[in-house]
Amino acid sequence: MFTFLVKRLFQALIVMFVISLVAFAIQDNLGDPLRELVGQSVSEAERQALRDELGLNDPFITKYTRFVGAALQGDLGTSYFFKRPAVDVILDKLVATLELVFGASFIIVCLSIPLGVYSAIHPKSFFTKLVMAGSSIGISIPVFLTAIMLMYVFSIELGWLPSYGRGETANWLGWESGFFTLDGLAHLVLPSIALASIMLPLFIRLVRSEMLEVLSSEYIKFGKAKGLALNKIYYQHALKNTMLPVLTVGGVQIGTMVAYTILTETVFQWPGTGFLFLEAINRVDTPLITAYVIFVGLIFVVTNTIVDLLYGIINPTVNITGKGA
């Protein structure tokens, strides 16, 4: 276990180094950040003086070394627009994004498992064919188009749900969230469905394929021959083994969904980190852009490590000790 953790920590450091290098390298290709700091009336000489003061004219290696030194102390720079530490700005918006990810994850879990299991148990039924056709269509539709269609149907035409914003929030034990109000939950529905549409078809197919593989195994056939109840075979034995790879993929996709929130949050004007990232690009707020990329990369690294560790604990056949079996 210790060897595994050390190995994963070393891999995580390498990945974060590469991510930070790429994130920092793209800063020079995003435009001039001074456009948000000074007005049009400022002379070129004053602009150059400000660039020197901010260190924008320094060589790349000098700027990157300075950035890494500050990052190791938890400082990823100060946002040009908000005039606050970039990490604080991201953390302020993170709660809204996590609400969206939780809502989408809830929908995915509640739909993919029963639909995938049913499709595996009844592979030739009409409903299974309908589910598979729907998942094929769902994979091919981009998330922004799904979001626009949902908004048009349920907000504009039917008027059932709000079309944009986070809605009313309430504070509970220091946690400011829309989960605690009906208005906040109503605002969460459409963005959550749109975000879930990215992963839901994939998870339905994943659960179905894993369940089919388990159902074709020898111990399932032996259980049927022994006369065990089919429900016990399907839901007590087969489903448990089906969930192992689903857990692995699902954990990794949590980090993916945080990154995928950019388009969903933009369409619904959801005040999360994805919407913040696009605004930072438009404003050429390079410290905030770099901090966001590194933050999302960190989420990927942490979730992958946790999933690998949990999978090794749940499935004893997986070797995480670094020793031979």
Locate the predicted segments by residue:
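Residue-level signal for discrete positions within transmembrane alpha-helices
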Residues: A12, K93, T97, A133-S136, ...
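Membrane-water interface segments at transmembrane-helix boundaries in multipass membrane proteins
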Residues: A133-I141, L145-L200
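An internal, D/E-rich "acidic patch" concept
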Residues: N57-I113
